[in-house]
Amino acid sequence: LPEKTTVWKAATLLAKELGAEPAVRISVTARIPERAGLGGSSADAGATLRALARLWGVNALDARVVGVARRVGADVAFFLQPVPSLYLGAGDVLEEAFPSFEAPIALVMPATNGISTQAAYDEFDRMGSEPVGYEDLCAALRAGDVRGAAAHLYNNLAPAASSLCGEVARVQEWLHDQPGVRASQVTGSGSCSFALCESTEDAERIAHV
């Protein structure tokens, strides 16, 4: 692995933090598109920390592991928690974890070069955004209410992503009109979107159009 990747940084920092011998071989099969808003490098680092924590006999939510995740970068700590969760700060302060639930999801990636995270945040700053509460969504997640959660999906970066890439807006319009889609939203800073579907069959149909 190149030494400047988030995976390398996560592994070496955790080994040092735990006093473990970093005698491990790590390979990464990249399946997450770049510039899609899916947290590719953060997800890689989070998965690395979870795997190494297990290997070295430490809980992935141990304060030392979380501390390393924060040092690696934004949102890495989020990927230490394998259940729906509310994180604050730079995606590194766990506010609440919710029960797991099953919900068929399809990802739709438009045929574009994607959107850089920095460009999305710059556009967000330019456009401005009113704060939106998340209590209704959290209440639905606590209750395992998929329909309620679908009704309160929100991403304040979505308008910026749509402004930078018209295909993002077109995908959202298309998903809105599809049968079997409970709700859809842009992932992170874009350019991918996800659809929360009624059934696995609906999700597969959306994913293979």
For each feature predicted by the language model, list its residue ranges.
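ATP-binding N-lobe of GHMP and related small-molecule kinases
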Residues: 1-36, 54-66, 100-102, 110-113
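Glycine/threonine-rich beta-strand-loop-alpha-helix active-site module
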Residues: 57-98
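Glycine-rich beta-strand-to-loop/alpha-helix junction loops that act as flexible
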Residues: 40-41, 186-191
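Conserved, helical-rich catalytic subdomain that frames metal- and/or nucleotide-binding sites
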Residues: 81, 86-183, 198-201, 208
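DPxDG-like acidic metal-binding loop motif
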Residues: 36-62, 78-82
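Generic non-transmembrane alpha-helical segments
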Residues: 9-17, 64, 68-71, 170-179, ...
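Short hydrophobic/aromatic beta-strand micro-patches
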Residues: 194-196
